[in-house]
Design a protein with these regions (language model features):
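N-terminal small/polar loop signature for handling phosphorylated ligands or for N-terminal nucleophile
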Residues: 1-16
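Short Gly/Thr/Asp-enriched flexible loops that form oxyanion-binding sites at enzyme active sites
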Residues: 12-30, 67
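Catalytic or ion-translocation cores adjacent to nucleophile or general acid/base/metal-coordination motifs
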Residues: 29-41
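Phosphate-binding and adjacent anionic-ligand microenvironments
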Residues: 2-3, 24-26, 44, 48-194
Length: 194
């Protein structure tokens, strides 16, 4: 196989592994998963003549900005919302009857392809993934190559997750103190951004 997918026990997130150009297995992170799904949905709707002016997609503020590049280049409205699917569901609800939601997700592997569930849904995401893999195969490509095509067309992004562990009671107190400090002395600039 070229791809493997798995879902979490409560069936709301899907994880993907695929082979790269060297035949090595690589894990597709949540940002890449959301990017692949939205790229395919948009490209497929355009190819089928189903894209409409009132279509929109949603991502959370912590999800890759490459999705904005895909949306902008394809003239589709993209909304940023707070982290958590309740906020994505809120955007769908606010536009119900006025605009058509076509997909959305977040970097924590949650994705929603249709608007009838209103929460992340690994079952529909797995179905969508199978469709994307078949579409890629029809083009003579792997899932990994589709991801590379996205990077060539829209730009490349690389991220790394760093977990900082603060164990025990002293760790909890240290975290609490850090959060209180952030609230009372918010940074004026982060990474050169104001």
């Amino acid at each position: 196989p070229h791809n493997v997918k798995g879902i979490c026990p409560d069936a709301d997130r899907v994880g993907i592994a695929c082979k790269n150009d060297k035949g090595e297995w690589v894990l597709i992170n949540g940002n890449q998963t959301c990017l692949l799904f939205l790229y395919y949905i948009i490209k497929n709707r355009i190819a089928m003549g189903k894209m409409k002016d009132d279509d929109f997609i949603v991502k959370t503020i912590v999800t890759t900005e490459l999705i904005k590049s895909v949306a902008d280049k394809n003239h589709i409205e993209m909304l940023d919302c707070y982290t958590g699917f309740k906020w994505i569901a809120r955007e769908i609800r606010l536009r119900e009857g006025k605009q058509q939601y076509i997909g959305g997700g977040e970097e924590s592997y949650g994705f929603l392809a249709e608007d009838f569930v209103r929460d992340k849904d690994a079952v529909s995401a797995c179905t969508l993934l199978a469709e994307i893999c078949a579409w890629a195969k029809d083009q003579g490509k792997t899932l990994f190559e589709v991801l590379l095509d996205i990077y060539v067309e829209y730009g490349f992004s690389k991220e790394t997750t760093v977990n900082v562990v603060k164990p025990g009671k002293s760790g909890a107190e240290e975290i609490k103190a850090m959060m209180e400090n952030f609230r009372s002395n918010p940074p004026r600039e982060i990474g050169g951004w104001r």
